[in-house]
Amino acid sequence: MTGIVAEGLRNSMDRASWIRDMFTEGARLKAEHGEENVSDLSLGNPILEPPEAVLEALRKLVNDPAPGSHRYIPNAGLPEVRQYIAESLEAGTSLPYTAEHIIVTCGAGGALNVALKALLDPGDEVVTLCPYFVEYDFYAANHGGKLIRAETGDDFQIDLEALEAAITPRTRAVIVNSPNNPTGVIYPEESLRAMGELLRAASGKHGRPIVLIADEPYRNLVFDGLTVPWIPPLYAHTLLVTSHSKDLGLAGERIGYLAVTPHLSEAALFCGAAVMANRILGFVNAPALFQRLLPMVAGASVDVRYYQNLRDRLLKPLREMGYRVVTPQGAFYLFPKSPIPDDVAFVRAAQSERLLVVPGSGFGRPGHFRISFSVTPEVVDRALPAFEKVFQQVGG
């Protein structure tokens, strides 16, 4: 008799077992030594509370609800919210977005699954720049696709030759995540423009458009006065996905959107397919309460200086210890090179010092490890001596 769980999902669970094992060990250390004695830099969970403007808007929505506020709503989202998002995007990109180009989703993860459901046939390929957000593998597999990795340089910037080599006649989409998880790098406009030219040529060569999916949940978490270039003006076949988990501190509320570039080939047809996907994947619609919230809190954001200060609090000491690390320009991650080639062994050595980080192998880049600085300053200060001890122990 075969097992009750589908073989494909069993395989996915096996591939994700390193995550489960890591968090099991973290829980054991906290239970044994006390949470206050463990430096947990493993989780990308936004630590900052929502801005006061968000809390005030929520109070208003809850205390003075409009009639019918909790009924079913359109699968694509509330029309007035979609129009608000479209106007915001038009202001940023100078492209003629309308409400019809917007599907409000259950976070960026929901938006990615909606997009891939609408795009992929069995056997199609999705290329992403490596290192990459670990869930991309599973999202592609959800819809019969296969994730293909295109390596980046030592600075984690786009390698156009590697990207071109990764594209085949089965390539349906390329996912770009900037600012990037796990590296924190921002891809500059000139690189993105060159990528667009490459994808236009590849689309012509293979006879169908390759869609560029811009995954941008960290767009508003950038440092040093930098900005994130808009991708849709650079490549017509772009889908923009994002969420308000990070900039508004609403990770648990699952509110984001998919924006279809107005000049996308068969844009109206794709929008209809995305709405259908949102429905039949079981999302149905994003939470109505938090949809209504968005236009009420335009311009609100968590204080990004908090994350920048923690980045700086880590960066200089780690380099002085001997760690090699590219300066993150956004998000809340560092992705140092492991002092030893085996990043998993390094992470285990760190656990012996009650220090929790994530092996780079899980992000497709062995020999590195990820630090999340979405923590308190006290956790950072407690972690630094442990980083130094581990570096000395492994012979870095």
Model-predicted segments: where are they?
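Conserved core of the PLP fold type I
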Residues: 67-207, 219-234, 239, 380
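Short beta-strand
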Residues: 38-40, 241, 324-329, 361-362
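PLP-dependent enzyme catalytic core of the Aspartate aminotransferase-like
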Residues: 87, 164, 299, 348, ...
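N-terminal small-domain helix-loop-helix segment of the aminotransferase-like
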Residues: 2-107, 114, 290, 297-304, ...
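Conserved glycine-rich beta-strand-loop-beta hairpin in the small C-terminal domain of fold type I
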Residues: 288-295, 307-319, 325-337, 367
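Alpha-helix termini
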Residues: 28-34, 92-94, 198-209, 262-268, ...
